[in-house]
Amino acid sequence: MKHNNKVSKRLTMTWVPLLCISCFFLGAIFTSKLRSASSDSGSQLILQHRRDQELKIVTQDYAHEKKKSQDNDVMEEVLKTHKAIESLDKSVSMLQKQLSATHSPQQIVNVSATNSSTEGNQKNKVFMVIGINTAFSSRKRRDSLRETWMPQGEKLEKLEKEKGIVVKFMIGHSSTPNSMLDKEIDSEDAQYNDFFRLDHVEGYYNLSAKTKSFFSSAVAKWDAEFYVKIDDDVHVNLGTLASTLASHRSKPRVYIGCMKSGPVLTKKTAKYREPEFWKFGEEGNKYFRHATGQIYAISKDLATYISNNQPILHKYANEDVTLGSWFIGLEVEQIDDRNFCCGTPPDCEMRAEAGEMCVATFDWKCSGVCRSVDRMWMVHVMCGEGSKAVWDANLKLS
């Protein structure tokens, strides 16, 4: 028994150090693994944190770039708007340069009067300028007027110098430069010296443009108190016309003639069809009141207004309607004088016998004297005022 106890003690004493050493190494190995695991875990945490930081930076950069892009877009739109405003300002400025006046009719007239007085030193001052509307094919009509109420040669020149009355046939040019039509007018003008040539292409459907051209050109050449347009198939008493206009000298803006308000024609087959009929309201409406186109007169300020504003004055199909439309909205006195539209005999003859001499005579149904080439002489004999009337008119120039 004693021997066994001794053996047990020896074994115990031998294995204790071994167990301690083994435990030590096992502890060291376990601790090393724990440290290794802990180190790996820390590295992963650090890596994850770094990635989070990088993602945050990238996100912030993206947001910054997006905001920057949006800011650029906004700035680009602002620049576009600014450029558009500048372009609009330039357009308005150009339009303002084309207009002589932009605020009111009174200002327009004041500007017109100033321009006229400035240029007056270079223009002949006269009482009235009469433009007789004619065409290439109307030679016989022109001759019928030369043989009746329109003075010729030296008398025509004397009428301008002594009475301040200018009477001219107004005509443009053909669509082909230096055509036979133009040369025929050149030859006729060389013979009579009674044409006023316009920078205008002749044509029946261009009468509104021709009227605008006449007033503009006449204002540029003569400083007149009145400007008159007459058709070449109308009989006129020059002395009565001059005296009538002289009675309105004190009025600054007058529009004189036989005022009417005819229907707006919409049918395509109608001779005087108005393509822009819709501007005048419902079907069946009438035009605003305007002077009939056979003869009318306007004062200096209105003619100058047309000249100054011709680029923006709208033209309708009918010339007389067009002229009336230009004065809508202006402070203009319309004078409806029925002596401007007497009928042919017996109407004008009866008036003459009653002491009421007509300014102009024509037939409404023909928009002029019917068969004027054949009948103008008869009308002149029965309704004319006499050759001395125009020379007796008191037209002292102001």
UniProtKB/Swiss-Prot annotation:
<dbReference type="GO" id="GO:0006486">
    <property type="term" value="P:protein glycosylation"/>
</dbReference>
<keyword id="KW-0464">Manganese</keyword>
<feature type="glycosylation site" description="N-linked (GlcNAc...) asparagine">
    <location>
        <position position="206"/>
    </location>
</feature>
<protein>
    <recommendedName>
        <fullName>Probable beta-1,3-galactosyltransferase 5</fullName>
        <ecNumber>2.4.1.-</ecNumber>
    </recommendedName>
</protein>
<keyword id="KW-0812">Transmembrane</keyword>
<dbReference type="Pfam" id="PF13334">
    <property type="entry name" value="DUF4094"/>
</dbReference>
<feature type="glycosylation site" description="N-linked (GlcNAc...) asparagine">
    <location>
        <position position="115"/>
    </location>
</feature>
<comment type="similarity">
    <text>Belongs to the glycosyltransferase 31 family.</text>
</comment>
<keyword id="KW-0325">Glycoprotein</keyword>
<keyword id="KW-0333">Golgi apparatus</keyword>
<feature type="transmembrane region" description="Helical; Signal-anchor for type II membrane protein">
    <location>
        <begin position="11"/>
        <end position="31"/>
    </location>
</feature>
<keyword id="KW-0808">Transferase</keyword>
<keyword id="KW-0735">Signal-anchor</keyword>
<comment type="pathway">
    <text>Protein modification; protein glycosylation.</text>
</comment>
<keyword id="KW-0472">Membrane</keyword>
<dbReference type="GO" id="GO:0000139">
    <property type="term" value="C:Golgi membrane"/>
</dbReference>
<feature type="glycosylation site" description="N-linked (GlcNAc...) asparagine">
    <location>
        <position position="110"/>
    </location>
</feature>
<dbReference type="GO" id="GO:0008378">
    <property type="term" value="F:galactosyltransferase activity"/>
</dbReference>
<keyword id="KW-0328">Glycosyltransferase</keyword>
<keyword id="KW-1133">Transmembrane helix</keyword>
<dbReference type="InterPro" id="IPR025298">
    <property type="entry name" value="DUF4094"/>
</dbReference>
<dbReference type="Pfam" id="PF01762">
    <property type="entry name" value="Galactosyl_T"/>
</dbReference>
<comment type="function">
    <text>Beta-1,3-galactosyltransferase that transfers galactose from UDP-galactose to substrates with a terminal glycosyl residue.</text>
</comment>
<dbReference type="InterPro" id="IPR002659">
    <property type="entry name" value="Glyco_trans_31"/>
</dbReference>
